[in-house]
Amino acid sequence: MTLLPGLLFLTWLHTCLAHHDPSLRGHPHSHGTPHCYSAEELPLGQAPPHLLARGAKWGQALPVALVSSLEAASHRGRHERPSATTQCPVLRPEEVLEADTHQRSISPWRYRVDTDEDRYPQKLAFAECLCRGCIDARTGRETAALNSVRLLQSLLVLRRRPCSRDGSGLPTPGAFAFHTEFIHVPVGCTCVLPRSV
């Protein structure tokens, strides 16, 4: 699975927001100040419609694309079985031959949904390593001879921040602006040699 198309789109979006979007930059003489929205202009939890149109491909980024399936699985799990374990599993090849990559890995991980109301997208899938070490492929059990570490993806998001609508510099109650920000999102885990002490 390649993440390149999604990353290229997010880089393009960042450039557009920085150079071509007057509603985020403010008026021509505001020197790049983002537009300050009132609660009436944009209700809490919503992003500007023009950003939603441009950000249609946001859903191609793995941390965004996984959210709906994770929430559906979590809903089913409440009725069918206990929640997924957070302990390092014993790897039994006969049980995981048709499982997803994160379950067949010798540094297995699970996903959780991270929610931030001041971020757009508000929900992202974060990977969490299940083992401190890695699983020995011969025994199927964890070994401390290797370490599991997270793989991080840089993702462009929009961050809501309080702003002033009257030019006083003091935040106007309920008003906010959108700022672009790159964050590091854990998308998986891999096995590495331990750092020497």
Curated annotation (Swiss-Prot):
This is Interleukin-17C. Pfam families: IL17. Its main location: secreted. Binds to a heterodimer formed by IL17RA and IL17RE. Disulfide bonds join 129-189, 134-191. It is found in: Secreted. It comes from Homo sapiens. The lineage of its organism: Eukaryota, Metazoa, Chordata, Craniata, Vertebrata. Keywords: Cytokine, Disulfide bond, Inflammatory response, Secreted, Signal. Residues 1-18 form the signal peptide. Induction: Up-regulated by bacterial stimuli, including by lipopolysaccharides (LPS) in gut epithelial cell lines. This up-regulation may be mediated by Toll-like receptors TLR2 and TLR5. Up-regulated by various pro-inflammatory cytokines, including TNF, IL1B and IL17F. Up-regulation by IL17A in colon epithelial cells has been observed in some cases, but not in others. InterPro entries: Cystine-knot_cytokine, IL-17_chr, IL-17_fam. GO terms for biological process: cell surface receptor signaling pathway; cell-cell signaling; inflammatory response. GO terms for molecular function: cytokine activity. Cytokine that plays a crucial role in innate immunity of the epithelium, including to intestinal bacterial pathogens, in an autocrine manner. Stimulates the production of antibacterial peptides and pro-inflammatory molecules for host defense by signaling through the NF-kappa-B and MAPK pathways. Acts synergically with IL22 in inducing the expression of antibacterial peptides, including S100A8, S100A9, REG3A and REG3G. Synergy is also observed with TNF and IL1B in inducing DEFB2 from keratinocytes. GO terms for cellular component: extracellular region; extracellular space. Belongs to the IL-17 family.
